């Protein structure tokens, strides 16, 4: 199974969970992925990692903004160094820097992050991840779920996605 298939399955499962919790979307994930819909539909803004509108060919957008909320897709640390040098702290710092960048692209700040999902390849890495995670939220962190998973794309030790509010100006 390739990364795109894995992420597509995750997106569909995550959408099902959100639906079960009463969170609705303006466009179904299946329709959005299959239709090649334009980057802006029903007030939905889809941005790439440079903050520019995404292409119709992009399957996964790192930033989606809708009704004052910023959805940041899962960010992983795809480390190319020797595995012996990998630490949960270095991976978490890499991921949180990406999260911060994407939240800011969407018009938010780390103080406006409402919720985060953390995926760890080893639950034993929770302490190291949490220590780094906490440094990004000096005024208190968001609601957070942390789960251990069998593997993550690109051999990342951690992947994080989040939802933030657009900051008031």
Regions found by a protein language model. Give the residues of each.
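N-terminal presequence-like segments and the immediate start of the first folded domain
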Residues: 2-93, 121-169
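Short, well-ordered amphipathic alpha-helical segments that serve as non-catalytic structural scaffolds
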Residues: 90-104
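Phosphate/pyrophosphate-binding loops at sites that engage ATP/ADP/AMP, CoA/4′-phosphopantetheine
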Residues: 102-113
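Acidic helix-start/capping segments at beta-turn-to-alpha-helix junctions
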Residues: 113-122
